[in-house]
């Protein structure tokens, strides 16, 4: 049993379960998740999708988020560094960053995703290190800059590339770093090319992530903004 109850609204609307995810050598994160996210896709109203093309990808625990969380443990930023997470979903990567000693602002476009993420931060006793807020990266309303911005599996749709890059231009400090993990999708390649053309230095680290008995290939892209 969890140490405190699942919020009534989440328990009413979703079939939920708990999963334990190994992040660091001695660090496991317990995560409240949707048991079968595919059910949510099957239930989408086509008119609702056509209006804003919103699919419930936030409900998945993605191997890319696991890979990014592990990367943050293996290559730690200075303790207390303030970072911004884009598209946090149920919170795995941002909560992993908080467990690694970072001060995290995690954002998503879906209020239910943020509700899961807040619960998961509290579940792992990290709600004091991570805050959550709504963000539409097409119209960001951020009032500060960050040394580090992260995102897992957010490069899959090319129409999102330009809004993400504009947000990074406005939000990432000079000399700052953007970490983006991706399951080696072809859609990531034009994003990388565009970032390099904008003056970012790029490197990539492939990782193997085993999750739910399946081996997954994840690429952690590292972009450094010019000073």
Segments the model singles out, each with a brief description of its role:
Residues 1-227:
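S-adenosylmethionine-dependent methyltransferases
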